[in-house]
């Protein structure tokens, strides 16, 4: 869990990251209202993502309940979204 508060699903990623593109595509396909934060366009966002996850890996997906996932598979992400009531 993270101490950061997000009103909706927030994903930290980068365009060059294959896992980021895959996770973002799943969020889009499921119709999840989410914010996408590009860590390349906003260098401070990379620091925020690392502070949340404790790792430098992306994507970092933060759920409104404070839970976060790092490099989730589609199945893991969809299960977390369902468990948190997002979908």
Language-model features: locations:
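Extracytoplasmic thiol/disulfide redox context detector
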Residues: 1-10, 78, 83-86
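Local sequence-structure signature of Cys/Sec-based thiol-disulfide redox active-site neighborhoods
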Residues: 2-30
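Short active-site oxyanion
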Residues: 8-10, 33-35, 65-67
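Thiol-based oxidoreductase modules, predominantly thioredoxin-like and allied folds used
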Residues: 32-46
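Short polar/charged helix/loop
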Residues: 44-52, 78
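Structural micro-motif
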Residues: 52-61
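Non-catalytic, surface beta->alpha helical segment in thiol-disulfide oxidoreductase systems
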Residues: 63-87
């Amino acid at each position: 869990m993270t101490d950061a508060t997000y009103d909706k699903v927030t994903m930290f990623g980068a365009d060059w990251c294959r896992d980021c593109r895959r996770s973002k595509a799943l969020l889009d396909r499921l119709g999840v209202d989410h914010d996408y934060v590009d860590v390349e366009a906003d260098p401070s966002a990379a620091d925020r993502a690392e502070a949340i996850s404790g790792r430098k890996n992306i994507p970092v997906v933060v759920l409104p309940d404070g839970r976060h996932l790092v490099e989730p598979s589609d199945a893991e992400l969809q299960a977390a979204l369902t468990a948190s009531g997002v979908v």
